[in-house]
UniProtKB/Swiss-Prot annotation:
PANTHER family: ARABINOSE-BINDING PROTEIN-RELATED (PTHR43649), POLYGALACTURONAN_RHAMNOGALACTURONAN-BINDING PROTEIN YTCQ (PTHR43649:SF33). The gene is lipO. It is a lipid-anchor. It comes from Bacillus subtilis (strain 168). A lipid is attached at residue 22 (N-palmitoyl cysteine). Keywords: Cell membrane, Lipoprotein, Membrane, Palmitate, Signal. It is found in: Cell membrane. This is Lipoprotein LipO.
Amino acid sequence: MKIRMRKKWMALPLAAMMIAGCSHSETSNSASGSKDTIKIMAPLLSPESPSDKSPSLKALEKYTGKEIKVTWVPDSSYNDKFNIVMASGEMPHAIVIKDKSAGFIKSVKAGAFWELSPYLKDYKNLSQADEKILKNSSVNGEVYGIYRTRDLIRACMIIRTDWLKNVGLDMPETLDDFYEVLKAFKEKDPDGNGKDDTYGMVVPKWMGLGNGSPWDVLQIWFGAPNRYGVENGKLIPDFTTKEYMDALTFFKKLYDEGLINKDFAVMDSAKWNDPVVKGKAGVIVDTGSRASQIQSAMEEADESNKDIIDIVGSLEGPNGKRTFPTSGYSGMITIPKSSVKTEKELKEVLSFLDKMNDKEAQILTNNGVKGRNYELKDGVFTSLEKNNKSLLYEHEGLAQFSMSIPKSEYYIEDQKTKLFQHRKDIITEGEKIAVFNPAESLVSDVYTQKGAQLDNIILDARTQFIIGEIDEKGFDDAVELWKKSGGNELMKDLNKLYQSSK
């Protein structure tokens, strides 16, 4: 698909509303400011935002040649504040967008942001944006933001290798192997305490569909599509396929046999690691970064727990090896037309964003200042922030407007570990066998209005089927309810967009 260029723009209606409740590093009411100042709105996930005097921020300003003024908004209320900002007319030069929310799509349709695809080719880093990820982050083929890179391949199975050794099994390679491992972790006393107090895999409560849940990953291994399949040239929902039902039947088997936690539908995801760390479960299906978290926690509990955790990228199923990819991005950085009024100003902001992707800028935003936040000896990175959170907060928030295009070049502390190397191998292998969502870039008005309601119908039916409240006919009835509640309308709209995108 070619990323299309938008040539005509609509004016965004402005309301006289004031921005409230945001912590920021400047007090000027002028959104345009001087040409030497770049104003940014970004979410704050840390307890503290970087101050105006942050050494990392000052070094970043020196490197980019711009004074950087950031309006920090608490992450929990970010989308609400975005809507207020868009109505106020008092906009910064760049706004971090977390997702394709209804408010963002409405603003795009009102012509609020620059369409960037004609300009990216003129910049050293931005010109190297991945075409597939650029498509995924687009709105029906039009690019309204510079995506923030995240690994395209993250999904994996995390497993306790000490338990594997104790039950006499090798690392699983197929779905059949996977089942046998979970069964052994339940029945063969993998922790050796003589008690029936372990199970195979822990799964938390998970909202949404096609967003990387353990169920999503396993469905791909079973051969189901990623959110939507293509049949006779048309999109179809994944949950209408035989492969999806095969996966769902497998999930129910795991539940019935006690191989997963009985409270999966309500378990707090913040406690997801605990059963593995505490020796109650032996498997999690999530991401490589979670594997590193668990390994670190286990070593903190007992220094002898070296290399206990390992990972497998994908398991061979009926259709061979397949893996669940991410969209390749986590939000994007947009440029409003009301504050960046001319092409000359646009190119100046793009030059700044391009420079933010240089290795030097990536290190400042993600690692901080050498000698203060970290040290580098013989090429080995060591953080100096472990016992000093205030040092971390000097730069942690700055990573919210780091894009890492064409690739991440900042330092990662565990890069010398066996787990990190396995993660790299999984990414390389996964890119060859990834099953992508063919509708990732498509934004349907029907889904914007009814998507949450429609998704909940399937989410509820999936849980009810797994725990035995409904059978296959009951699930089919839920699919019919989905269709009558707007699903048929959604598929008609998506297929129209899909045909136009080819």
